[in-house]
Amino acid sequence: KHLAELDFLQAQINPHFIYNTLSSIRFLLEMDKVQEAGEMVFYFSKLLRQTLSRSVEFIPLGEELDTLKCYVELQHLRYPDTFDYSCEVDEALRDNTLPKLLLQPVVENSIFHGVGRHKIHIRLRGWLEGDTLILRVEDDGVGISKDKIDQVMNKDLQINRVGLKNVQERIRLNYGPGYGLT
């Protein structure tokens, strides 16, 4: 049962990500931004190769960061001058493994819910605490209320969206209830 539930949650991420990216490309084409749409197709095809070509659940952090970089470039094309992104993860950590597509939904949340009137700064940091890999995504965007976070994370909600709830479930299924998003 545990493996079937994990497979179900992992399978949800790819369609969510694909639909959002195709919507972004469509948006650029509607705005007659053909060159930017072409660049998005380039990054999108690279992402598809990285995320769909390997049928493994865990990947090295380095691959996850490379995939995330492509995603960030896609969003920079769609939302120019709305956010900056920095990644502070020691090269020595790149071989640590984690469930694939764990970081992209978190950064996506920062972009789509953090952008307001001002340019935001999204920062990914990674380090080891003992033998635990800690990855922190921070932004200085408009923020989200505790009630909204609780609503998104509520297990009783129907799974009609993926994203943070999906990431939380996959972390807990893989590592136990003491781990997850905070």
Feature map (PLM): residue ranges:
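Two-component histidine phosphotransfer core
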Residues: 1-182
